[in-house]
Amino acid sequence: QLFTESVIDEVLLSMEKDDETSPDEILELFDLSQYRDRHPLSLSGGQKQRVAIASAVVSNREIIVFDEPTSGLDFKHMREVSRILKALANRGKTLLVITHDPELVMASCSYVIHMEKGQIKENYPLDVNGAKKVLNFFRI
């Protein structure tokens, strides 16, 4: 959900006051610099998605929930989101990624919790056997 009058304000809203990262660096990282002063609601679905992800990333929370983070993104930006998720995990962040995208699971996740009807059906590490389970689940 987007709350402010501009893309830059959306990022600033989530940033910690003592964060030394420039909000413009974050916009550049997410390929949003050209939309800096635009109202978030004037953006395409994929652009809005990237603004929301950028805001989550700069919030500096220990646990970040991503609900369908690649929804509405083109392939280039899907790969970039995957790279950013891995980088966040490598920095010690705990990420909960809710997705129906098997490529994102395989590229970005280390553990799978398979849910059905609000119940955990199965959970496993994304090792060789886990990867086979994911591919079988998505029938790939």
Predicted segments with their positions:
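Conserved ABC ATPase "signature" region
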Residues: 20-35
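Conserved ABC ATPase signature
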Residues: 39-43, 47
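Hydrophobic anchor residue at the start of the ABC signature
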Residues: 53
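Catalytic Walker B motif of ABC-type/P-loop ATPase nucleotide-binding domains
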Residues: 64-67
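H-loop/switch region of ABC-family ATPase nucleotide-binding domains
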Residues: 99-100
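A short, surface-exposed alpha-helical micro-motif characterized by mixed small hydrophobic
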Residues: 105-107
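Conserved beta-strand-loop-alpha-helix hinge in the C-terminal portion
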Residues: 119-139
